[in-house]
Amino acid sequence: MLEKIQETAAFLKGKMHTSPETAIILGTGLGSLANEITEKYEIKYEDIPNFPVSTVEGHSGKLIFGKLGNKEIMAMQGRFHYYEGYSMKEVTFPVRVMRELGIKTLFVSNASGGTNPEFEIGDLMIITDHINYFPEHPLRGKNIPYGPRFPDMSEAYDKELIRKADAIAAEKGIKVQHGIYIGTQGPTFETPAEYKLFHILGADAVGMSTVPEVIVANHCGIKVFGISVVTDLGVEGKIVEVSHEEVQKAADAAQPKMTTIMRELINRIDTSLS
């Protein structure tokens, strides 16, 4: 595993002419943040040794390097999901490669179903914590020496980044929620009973990604900021039939607000933080 990570990182280093310390994983319907990246160059997943290839509509499958504002970044346009049949090690492989490339801060985004009755479709939820509901753990097996065998998860999402995001949202007049994200394996959307269960467990939103990448990022010593777009509601009396197309449509509608927060936050990262 470590050899594959290093082989992939060496391949990318040979193609890179920037040295980003910031990475972004762009989720469902949020890939258009890539349009904000300037001076960019791209590498398709299919051309990268050992990389899985995304199979989900709306995830185009490439690494993008360049600048967002004045900050050098790398972005994953298209992520890998457990429900696609990948192992957790494959799902999180890119995060370990990021660590090998010198990434210090990771920004993750996703679409989710809201279980908090105060949420509305289109809300942005800053992720303050998560619940891992996946059946396989990404750190299962021999420990890769990027971090300890038993990593601490008491601050999986960096509090200073959350504080700065709140300040940016207030400054720009963007409404944001705070909440706990629960990650499930999918690919089915939740039943009303499952939504109710997840709310009882303490989750404010549910989705099929993010948690594995965040666990591995924490193991690698990478700071994380996560934001979720509430694209449907799992609240009693508000549950309607949902499709992937509707999820993408709701995510696309919220995208300008998310882009503003991400762009501003990435450009306000302190050197000491990154």
Please place each PLM-identified region on the residue numbering:
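His/Asp/Glu-rich mid-to-C-terminal helical/loop segments that flank catalytic regions of hydrolases
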Residues: 235-274
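Metabolite-binding pocket within alpha/beta catalytic cores that recognizes anionic/polar moieties
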Residues: 1-153
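Metal-dependent peptidase/peptidase-like ectodomains
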Residues: 143-181
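Generic non-transmembrane alpha-helical segments
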Residues: 11, 15, 160, 164-174, ...
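Short acidic/polar active-site loop segments enriched in Thr and Asp
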Residues: 104-105, 204, 223
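Non-catalytic positions within long, well-ordered alpha-helices that form the structural scaffold/packing
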Residues: 99-102, 199, 218
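Active-site/ligand-binding-proximal alpha/beta "capping" segment
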Residues: 168-204, 269-270
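Zn-dependent metallopeptidase/amidohydrolase metal-coordination segment
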Residues: 208-246
